[in-house]
Amino acid sequence: MTQKRRNCGRNKHGRGHTKFVRCINCSRAVPKDKAIKRWNIRNMVETAAIRDLSEASVYSEYAIPKIYVKLQYCVSCAIHARVVRVRSREGRRIRTPPPRVRYNRDGKRVNPAAIAKTAL
């Protein structure tokens, strides 16, 4: 039978069984190696309250702690929420991650490769 993906959509190679995790969107049980995982990193304090907190703080330089939340989706919810996209047959073979979109302070897109060339 034909195979759609080289890894069968999993990261299990050689293991017989992996534990299940729950999708954060629909609570579906998904094998841990198949779930689409993303980290959400943000400040514990919302942006509006950061200045108030720094003014009230005794310390001059206080690093506000961050919250690290691991988001785990099932395949259908990840596609629906556009965390991952459906790719063509040729596109599925590309294993390198897509280039990250970066913005400068003005809100304009920045190409890191072009900046590296101009810096030299």
From Swiss-Prot:
The keyword Transmembrane helix does not apply. GO terms for biological process: cytoplasmic translation; ribosome biogenesis. Residues 88-108 are annotated as: Disordered. GO terms for molecular function: mRNA binding; structural constituent of ribosome. It is found in: Cytoplasm. GO terms for cellular component: cytosol; cytosolic small ribosomal subunit. The keyword Ribosomal protein applies. Keywords: Cytoplasm, Ribonucleoprotein, Ribosomal protein. There are 2 genes for eS26 in S.pombe. Component of the small ribosomal subunit (SSU). Mature yeast ribosomes consist of a small (40S) and a large (60S) subunit. The 40S small subunit contains 1 molecule of ribosomal RNA (18S rRNA) and at least 33 different proteins. The large 60S subunit contains 3 rRNA molecules (25S, 5.8S and 5S rRNA) and at least 46 different proteins. eS26 interacts with eS1 forming part of the mRNA exit tunnel. eS26 interacts with TSR2. Component of the ribosome, a large ribonucleoprotein complex responsible for the synthesis of proteins in the cell. The small ribosomal subunit (SSU) binds messenger RNAs (mRNAs) and translates the encoded message by selecting cognate aminoacyl-transfer RNA (tRNA) molecules. The large subunit (LSU) contains the ribosomal catalytic site termed the peptidyl transferase center (PTC), which catalyzes the formation of peptide bonds, thereby polymerizing the amino acids delivered by tRNAs into a polypeptide chain. Belongs to the eukaryotic ribosomal protein eS26 family. This is Small ribosomal subunit protein eS26A. It comes from Schizosaccharomyces pombe (strain 972 / ATCC 24843) (Fission yeast). The gene is rps2601.
